[in-house]
Amino acid sequence: TEDDGVALREIAWVQYKKSIDRWFFWESTYYNDYQGGRGQTNVFQNAATFSGPTSMNASLGETGWNHSNGDGVLFYPGTDTVFPAESYGIQGPIASLRLKHWRRGIQDVDYISMAAAVNPVATQAIVNKMVPKALWDYGVANLADPTWVRTDISWSIDPNVW
């Protein structure tokens, strides 16, 4: 997606902070854009994995309703049978950077949990510094549809901070 690499690493930190036991991705191999009607996607040639009608914007590039690059793709095909010219001929999938960042966040939480067993107050202070606000911490935009308020993120996008 149009997001920084740390976003997937940060998900595990939010899970820890909010005591969320599970976090599921909606899809990991979304190569067929049946929702947007674009059909099979050559993920090695086209980053857009799904979208509705799109247009070109001079500063943003291709945009449109629900336009998303790489969303729903955590793995790439090692052997591509739909687009064989792009196939790498590898048995099994190729892990995406998104998957690797998510794994790194889960590993971070393992260390956070060990640190919390020794000093929970100091550990929580570190978590709160790294992820000041997330999800519903900003409030609710519409009480009839209690989704979180859309706002700027509260954590650093600098990978060196993480």
Where are these regions (language model features)?
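Catalytic domains of carbohydrate-active enzymes that cleave complex glycans
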Residues: 20-21, 37-162
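Catalytic-core regions of glycoside hydrolase
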Residues: 1-37
